[in-house]
C-alpha cells in the first residue's frame, strides 16, 4: 500500500502549481547540497531512488491492486493530519486529489491542526497519514537518517529495521566514526533501506524566494540552521 500511495503522488505538479517558489520535487530522504565528502554531494541528484517513489500511475495501480488482494478490501479511507498554514493545506488538498483520482476506492480526509498539536499527535501515533517537514540542524546526512532509528521520537511511523539501526549505530558511535569513506557508504546504504521500504514519501526540497534591493549586499544564505545571516549586510 505504501508503494501505491507514493507512486500516485505527482510531485512536479505540487511544486509547479502549489508551492511555486523554486522548490524542487524530491525522490530521496536527504536533500541536495547538504553534505559533501571529497567534494562530492551525498545527494548529487534526485534520481537514485526515483524508482521507489516517482509518480507512475501504472505502478501505483499495480501495487494498489496487490494491496487490495492482500487485505481483502476494495476501498480504503485514510485521514491525513496537516498544519493549519495556507501552504500546507494547499499541498494537502493536491495530495488528496492525486491519491483519490489515481487510486479508485481511495478516500482521503484532512484533519487540520496547529503545528504543535500535529507534531504531538504524530509523536503519539495518533494518525494514519501526516504531512510534515524537516529542516537540517547540521550539514550531515545523519540529521535526516537519524530520525528513523527504532524508538526515535521523530520516527512517527514507528518503523523498525535491525539492519538500519545497526548501520546508524556504526556511523554514530561505532568504528565508522573515524572512517569517513566507510561512514559515507554506510549512510547511503541506510538511506536505500528507508527508500526501498517506503518509510516516508518525499515530496519536495524547499526553496526560499527573496527579493533583495540592488543597494543591499552581504546577506548570507545557508542550507542549515539559520537560513539567512545578516551580520555582514550593508545598505549602500
Where are these regions (language model features)?
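Solvent-exposed loop/turn segments at secondary-structure junctions
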Residues: 11-14, 21-25, 33-37, 84-88, ...
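Structural transition elements
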Residues: 25-66, 87-89
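Ligand/substrate-recognition segments at binding pockets and active sites
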Residues: 61-136, 208
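Long beta-strand-rich cores associated with HINT superfamily self-processing modules
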Residues: 210-236
Amino acid at each position: 500500500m505504501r508503494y501505491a500511495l507514493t507512486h500516485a503522488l505527482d510531485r512536479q505538479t505540487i511544486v509547479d502549481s502549489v508551492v511555486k517558489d523554486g522548490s524542487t520535487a524530491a525522490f530521496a530522504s536527504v536533500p541536495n547540497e547538504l553534505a559533501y565528502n571529497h567534494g562530492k554531494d551525498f545527494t548529487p541528484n534526485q534520481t537514485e531512488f526515483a524508482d521507489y517513489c516517482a509518480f507512475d500511475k501504472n505502478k501505483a495501480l499495480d501495487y494498489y491492486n496487490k494491496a487490495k488482494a492482500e487485505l481483502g478490501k476494495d476501498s480504503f479511507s485514510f485521514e491525513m493530519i496537516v498544519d493549519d498554514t495556507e501552504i500546507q493545506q494547499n499541498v494537502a488538498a493536491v495530495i488528496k486529489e492525486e491519491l483519490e483520482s489515481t487510486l479508485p476506492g481511495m478516500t482521503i480526509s484532512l484533519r487540520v491542526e496547529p503545528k504543535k498539536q500535529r507534531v504531538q499527535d504524530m509523536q503519539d501515533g495518533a494518525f494514519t497519514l501526516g504531512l510534515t517537514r524537516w529542516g537540517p540542524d547540521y550539514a550531515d546526512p545523519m540529521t535526516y537518517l537519524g530520525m528513523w532509528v527504532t524508538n526515535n521520537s521523530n520516527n512517527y511511523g514507528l518503523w523498525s529495521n535491525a539492519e538500519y539501526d545497526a548501520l546508524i549505530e556504526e556511523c554514530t558511535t561505532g568504528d565508522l566514526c573515524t572512517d569517513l569513506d566507510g561512514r559515507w557508504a554506510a549512510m547511503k546504504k541506510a538511506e536505500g533501506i528507508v527508500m526501498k521500504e517506503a518509510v516516508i514519501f518525499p515530496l519536495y526540497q524547499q526553496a526560499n524566494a527573496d527579493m533583495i534591493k540592488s543597494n543591499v549586499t552581504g546577506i548570507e544564505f545557508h542550507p542549515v540552521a539559520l537560513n539567512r545571516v545578516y551580520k555582514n549586510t550593508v545598505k549602500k
